[in-house]
C-alpha cells in the first residue's frame, strides 16, 4: 500500500540551495545551524538519488539513513531479571 521510504542526510555548503533539494524527494527537516537537510525518497531510488546529490556543487557529503534496517521491536525483561536482589528504597 505505502512505498518503502528511506531517509537521506545531505550536508550543504550553504542553505541558499535548500529549495533545490525538493526535486529529489520530500524534505523533512533543514538545520540552519549545522547546515544539513533530511529528505525522504523511495528505497528503490536511494542509490540513484545519492549519486545525483553528491555531484551537485553545493553539497558537501551525502549519507543514507539506516533506520529501515534497524530492529525497532524490543523485548521486555523476563520475570527473573525484573526481581533485583538489591531492593531500591
Curated annotation (Swiss-Prot):
Pfam families: DUF2129
Domain of life of the source: Bacteria
Keyword Isomerase: no
Keywords: Cytoplasm
Predominant place of localization: cytoplasm
Localization in the cell: Cytoplasm
Gene Ontology terms: cellular component: cytoplasm
Protein family (similarity comment): Belongs to the UPF0298 family.
Protein name: UPF0298 protein GK1096
